[in-house]
Amino acid sequence: MGFWLSLCGAVVLVAYLLGSFPTGYIAVKQLKGIDIREVGSGSTGATNVLRTLGKGPGAFVLGLDCLKGVLAIALVYYLFTFASNQNLIPTTVNIELWQPWLVTLAGIAAILGHSKSIFLGFTGGKSVATSLGILLAMNWQVGLATFGVFAVVVAISRIVSLSSIMGAIAVSIVMVFLQQPLPYILFGIAGGLYVILRHRSNIERLLAGTEPKIGQKLVTETEQSA
């Protein structure tokens, strides 16, 4: 059992490291020579990359951040397949019970990695794209439904942060509606709340009516008072 627990712990650690890979930071550093944490919202996510570099790099970072979430969950599935074939899973382990919980832990680790990257002094993005990748890997129907909510809101409002918040709220509702395992539902609640908390400054701007729409530049307090 000790070896099995070590394998599970290693998978969660790798999931965190995958989430920590600073795609947005590297893209902006390589293409513009600046630290993305010092411009716009200070986030390393795709939206801030979009404002800083444009649509192409923004879409590229969005895809890679989403892929990080997919890979984190795929790693868990691979572990169970490999360990089962090699008879590494203890007979006392109920796979149907363990796998959803380990998927959930790996998902949480990837989200924390993206927003608290060990490679960036525990700073990062808001974990929206990485969360989407996790949801798609957990259950593609949940992922698509959540993305659908995001897409509808962004099409109407043209505000990415509002769309992300509404998607975060929708996750747990969709999980319950589609009768997902309890660990997934708990992930939807905890992950959704975490994403919303990461948008605190956006919520303040939304309430003040100063949150930029797609294509608009974020005006900082310094620029407003200049």
UniProtKB/Swiss-Prot annotation:
Organism in which the protein naturally occurs: Nostoc sp. (strain PCC 7120 / SAG 25.82 / UTEX 2576)
UniProt pathway annotation: Lipid metabolism; phospholipid metabolism
This protein's UniProt keywords: Cell inner membrane, Cell membrane, Lipid biosynthesis, Lipid metabolism, Membrane, Phospholipid biosynthesis, Phospholipid metabolism, Transferase, Transmembrane, Transmembrane helix
Keyword tRNA-binding set for record: no
Family the entry assigns: Belongs to the PlsY family.
Subunit-structure text: Probably interacts with PlsX.
Protein name per UniProt: Glycerol-3-phosphate acyltransferase
Matches recorded under SMART domains: G3P_acyltransf
GO CC terms of this entry: plasma membrane
Cross-referenced NCBIfam families: glycerol-3-phosphate 1-O-acyltransferase PlsY
